[in-house]
Every structure is written in structure tokens, then in C-alpha cells.
């Protein structure tokens, strides 16, 4: 269990940034139906989770600052023995207090939330702060209600984004642990790679190995691509036959992430099926480029640098290599390179796999990034990426995953 002081501290930071005479309203969200009465596995709104540690539907959180005094209340669904018979035991107020670091007196029945909401919406001396980054309808419905009365509503996600961008030790260690679980699962899956193995077999092995290491809510849909399926970057429907079969002389691309304490890993690995046939093997030629890009990327990352600057450096290195292969002209432009370099090199990482933060923001110590240079060459019938996770430090960056990219670990069979 995560130390509740972490969530208490997050709320203190949030409240310190909250303007006076303001009430912030956040919601965990509601379960989503898959079909009929079957539901998807639930994941709380990430800003709500950041402030509470609660991963259950139907909760509301109200943090108010009035005349400098901060009050916090969480509203929880009442226990219902009939619902619990079908869906399992629900937390009682003491359980909720233990997770969130709130006093039990600050945990209230959800029925009281409507009364509190009405009181706040009626009070014109209190400004309302809602989460405009939410995928839920509730904040936007409330925004419409408040604005009908001529009052302005502020966006609390500006506060949570600034907090979530700078990771605390618990957060970086959670990402490190998620990366460890992910890589252990990849290592176990690698043992199955051989000519004739299917994407489906490798996919199920990855998810089994992550689940048995206590990661059930994965960071994103697991990707396993054999051969030319690697040209579909988010190939998340593994095939049992046809193009989904690993062939001698081809590749297997995996892109996968465990989740630990709510935090995501994002790891991509490529494996070569069968021994390369000398220096002319195009898999090895492309691997040499990707390894050079990775080294340059991790050398580049540090405080004050940007995603745009990182991409620019990757395009320059890749462009010179592509020109040397006769694939683009020597006087290439960025557009020439992007015919082969399809995606951004990096993104923020945290409670979301593509975590919050503006893409034009300079890197700062405490940012966590996933770094994934990738090149895809249709003329060669091959393309792949290798991805690792890192923490921006005061003088550069620190890998949170292993950084494996040696040919010895990539060639299988």
C-alpha cells in the first residue's frame, strides 16, 4: 500500500496553488459498459487519483480555500450488501481514510455531495474550479450551470499538470518498478520467439507475465507485431496466422507497459528472428542507426531542452543516414526524413502513458520521459523502434529501464 502521506502532500501542494475563495470539484468517474451488463475494468480520473489514491467509481472530492482556510472532503458511495454480493466488498470510510490520508470525519456519504454542490453553486462569493482536461461530462455540465449565472469557472488542470510534471521519489520508483516488471515479462516472452510463433502467443505471454507480477491494469493496449505488421504503429490486434507469424529473417516488435501504483512504463523492444546473414543484413544496418539515435537522444536530454530540439537532432542524424543509403537526396529537408521517421521521439510519462504537459515546455529536473526513436523503411520491408524510460536530472537524464539494445540480446535463434 502506498504511504497515504503521498496523497496528503499532493493535496497540500494543490491547495497552496488554489486561489482564495475557491472550491475545486473532482470526480473519480463512473464505470463504463462494454456490452449489456458487462463493464470494462475501471480506472479513476488521473487527477482525482493523484490527489486521493482512490481507484473506484462514483467518488467526489471537494477542496475549498476560504479566507486562507483549507477544507477537504471526499464523498463515497454507501456500502450496499446486495451490490457487494455481485461486485465484491466495497471500502468503508475507515478504508478510504487509510488510503487517502484524510481523517475519517472528512469522508462523507455520497448522498451529501449533491447538497454540498448546490451550496457551492449558489454561493456567488466562492469561485468554482473544475477539471477541463477530464474525459467525463460532469465537469462540463457544472461549468454550464455556473456560467449561466454569469460566474467564471477556472481550470484546475493547470495546477495538477504543473504538479504531475515534476515527479516525486515515490513516482519515479513506481515507474522504475513498472519498467522492471515489463522487462521481465519481455524476457520471458523472448524465450518463445522462433520461426512459426504467432503474435497471439507472444501477446498472451506478455500479459500473463505482467499480471502474475502484480500488474493487472496495463499502461496501454499491448502491441506485438511480426514482420511488416510493424509498419502499423499501434497494431493492437495480435494475429494467429498469416502476417502474424514470425518468419526466419524477419523481426518481432513489442511495445508494452506495466502499471505500478498507478504509474506507467512504456518499453519497446525489437527481436530478430534468425541469425543475420553478414553485414548486408538490413536489420543490422537499421539497428546500428537506432542505437546511434538512442545514444544521441539520451545525451541530449536535460534541463532546458525541448521535444522539438530532440526531434530536430534525430531528423538530422537520420537524414544523413538515409541519404547515405540513397533513400533521400543529400540536400534533404525535414519532410524527406519524416517519410521514414514517423513519430515523435519522446513524450512525458507518468499516471498516463502519454502524460500531461505541453509539448513546447522545456524539460526540467523531475520530468519522466519515454524515449523511442524509430525508423520505418517500406522499400526495405522493415522498420522498428526501441524505447526506454528516463528521469530528467539536474545535469542530464537517468534511465529508469535497462536500456537494452545490444545485438546479442536482440538476435533470437
Give the ranges of each region predicted by the language model.
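Active-site neighborhoods and metal-handling regions in enzymes and metal-associated proteins
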Residues: 1-413
Amino acid at each position: 500500500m502506498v504511504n497515504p502521506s503521498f496523497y496528503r502532500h499532493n493535496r497540500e501542494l494543490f491547495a497552496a496553488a488554489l486561489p482564495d475563495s475557491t472550491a475545486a470539484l473532482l470526480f473519480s468517474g463512473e464505470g463504463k459498459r462494454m456490452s449489456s451488463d458487462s463493464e470494462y475494468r475501471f480506472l479513476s480520473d488521473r487527477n482525482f487519483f493523484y490527489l486521493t489514491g482512490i481507484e473506484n467509481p462514483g467518488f467526489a472530492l471537494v477542496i475549498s480555500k476560504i479566507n486562507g482556510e483549507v477544507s477537504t472532503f471526499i464523498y463515497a458511495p454507501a456500502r450496499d450488501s446486495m451490490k457487494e454480493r455481485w461486485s465484491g466488498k466495497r471500502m468503508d470510510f475507515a478504508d478510504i481514510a487509510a488510503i487517502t490520508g484524510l481523517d475519517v470525519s472528512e469522508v462523507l456519504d455520497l448522498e451529501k455531495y449533491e447538497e454540498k454542490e448546490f451550496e457551492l453553486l449558489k454561493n456567488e462569493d466562492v469561485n468554482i474550479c473544475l477539471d477541463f482536461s477530464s474525459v467525463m461530462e460532469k465537469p462540463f455540465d457544472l461549468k454550464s450551470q455556473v456560467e449561466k449565472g454569469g460566474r467564471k469557472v477556472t481550470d484546475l488542470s493547470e495546477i495538477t499538470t504543473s504538479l504531475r510534471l515534476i515527479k516525486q521519489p515515490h513516482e519515479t520508483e513506481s515507474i522504475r518498478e513498472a519498467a522492471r516488471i515489463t522487462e521481465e515479462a519481455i524476457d520471458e516472452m523472448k524465450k518463445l520467439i522462433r520461426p512459426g510463433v504467432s503474435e497471439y502467443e507472444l501477446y498472451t505471454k506478455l500479459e500473463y507475465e505482467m499480471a502474475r507480477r502484480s500488474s493487472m491494469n496495463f499502461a496501454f493496449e499491448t502491441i506485438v507485431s511480426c514482420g511488416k505488421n510493424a509498419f502499423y504503429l499501434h497494431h493492437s490486434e495480435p494475429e494467429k496466422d498469416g502476417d502474424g507469424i514470425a518468419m526466419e529473417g524477419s523481426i518481432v516488435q513489442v511495445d508494452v507497459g506495466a502499471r505500478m501504483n498507478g504509474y506507467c512504463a512504456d518499453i519497446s523492444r525489437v527481436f530478430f528472428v534468425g541469425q543475420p546473414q553478414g553485414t548486408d543484413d538490413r536489420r543490422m544496418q537499421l539497428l546500428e542507426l537506432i542505437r546511434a539515435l538512442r545514444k544521441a537522444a539520451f545525451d541530449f536530454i536535460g534541463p532546458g531542452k525541448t521535444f522539438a530540439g530532440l526531434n530536430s537532432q534525430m531528423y538530422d542524424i537520420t537524414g544523413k543516414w538515409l541519404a547515405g543509403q540513397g533513400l533521400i537526396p543529400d540536400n534533404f529537408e525535414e519532410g524527406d526524413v519524416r517519410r521514414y521517421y514517423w513519430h515523435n521521439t519522446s513524450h512525458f510519462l507518468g499516471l498516463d502513458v502519454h502524460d500531461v504537459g505541453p509539448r513546447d515546455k522545456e524539460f526540467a529536473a523531475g520530468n519522466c520521459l519515454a524515449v523511442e526513436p524509430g525508423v520505418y523503411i517500406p522499400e526495405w520491408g522493415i522498420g522498428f523502434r526501441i524505447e526506454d524510460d528516463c528521469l530528467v536530472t539536474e545535469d542530464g537524464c537517468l534511465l529508469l529501464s535497462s536500456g537494452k539494445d545490444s545485438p546479442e540480446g536482440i538476435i533470437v535463434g
